[in-house]
Amino acid sequence: MTEHKSGFVSIIGRPNVGKSTFVNRVIGHKIAIMSDKAQTTRNKIQGVMTRDDAQIIFIDTPGIHKPKHKLGDYMMRVAKNTLSEIDAIMFMVNVNEDIGRGDEYIMEMLKNVKTPIFLVLNKIDLVHPDTLMPKIEQYQSYMDFTDIIPISALEGLNVDHFIDVLKSFLPEGPKYYPDNQISDHPEQFVVSEIIREKILHLTSEEIPHAIGVNVDRMIKEDEDRVRIEATIYVERDSQKGIVIGKGGKKLKEVGKRARRDIEMLLGSKVYLELWVKVQRDWRNKVNFIRQIGYVEDQD
């Protein structure tokens, strides 16, 4: 009988290297928020990948960055604490970029970790194959890795091969989650992240990190329709105007795009109602940060 492998794998890396894209690719559903703006992942997103011979729980940690407020401090603590809880570490980098200070900081942090560490060179679809070996050698000069795998999370290139390699290093174990469970977050959290993603896509650089989303109400009205009421929080009146847009046009577009993804997630029709409220300096208010879902694990 074939042994069953299971384990927890942390994905760590600088902002925008493709961690969320990878999680969504291997899970087959949108669990982690994707955007071209930095620091879009705020919580540990546990995506559960179940195969006949293995179950891997991927923890998509916030991108490593220098904190600028209490929410940033929280994001960094989540990233570092995750390393002590897992069976393997994926250190993901953008192969199309030079090694930066953030990469060096992460490698310094990983040097004393005993867990298997895989260097995953993402975005190989953007570079010539001849550039891969020099980049690999650069990273190897900093530290030893359990294995080094080039992939494209967006295109799916070499992702299955990486999963096979990863499985070989995981311990034998049971299924921690049912076959049909793809995340340990409640549906409301995933819904709020989908709404936040659409705002990130549609607003300018000043807005994204001032955005918080809370699902106030989510009820099944009948067999094939779910009613969702959510509040979008910003820090300034000017930001509220940007999110709403002229004549409410931008907010309507946010709702339209979010509704489409939420209906795919829930498998039913969705009535989505959105409000925008100003909560001044909310990223420095610990109680409010907890209130809208960014809560550290309790021991």
UniProtKB/Swiss-Prot annotation:
CDD domains: Era (cd04163), KH-II_Era (cd22534). It is a peripheral membrane protein. Residues 13-20 are annotated as: G1. Residues 39-43 are annotated as: G2. GTP binds at residues 13-20, 60-64, 122-125. Residues 5-172 form the Era-type G domain. It comes from the Bacteria. Residues 60-63 are annotated as: G3. Residues 122-125 are annotated as: G4. One of its GO terms (cellular component) is cytosol. It is found in: Cytoplasm; Cell membrane. Keywords: Cell membrane, Cytoplasm, GTP-binding, Membrane, Nucleotide-binding, Ribosome biogenesis, RNA-binding, rRNA-binding. Its main location: cytoplasm. Residues 203-280 form the KH type-2 domain. Residues 151-153 are annotated as: G5. It holds the Pfam family MMR_HSR1. GO terms for molecular function: GTP binding; GTPase activity; ribosomal small subunit binding; small ribosomal subunit rRNA binding. InterPro entries: G_ERA_dom, GTP-bd, GTPase_Era-like, KH_dom-like_a/b, KH_dom_type_2, KH_sf_prok-type, P-loop_NTPase, Small_GTP-bd. GO terms for biological process: ribosomal small subunit assembly. Belongs to the TRAFAC class TrmE-Era-EngA-EngB-Septin-like GTPase superfamily. Era GTPase family. HAMAP family: GTPase_Era. NCBIfam families: era (TIGR00436), PRK00089.1 (NF000908), small_GTP (TIGR00231). An essential GTPase that binds both GDP and GTP, with rapid nucleotide exchange. Plays a role in 16S rRNA processing and 30S ribosomal subunit biogenesis and possibly also in cell cycle regulation and energy metabolism. Monomer. This is GTPase Era. It comes from Staphylococcus epidermidis (strain ATCC 12228 / FDA PCI 1200).
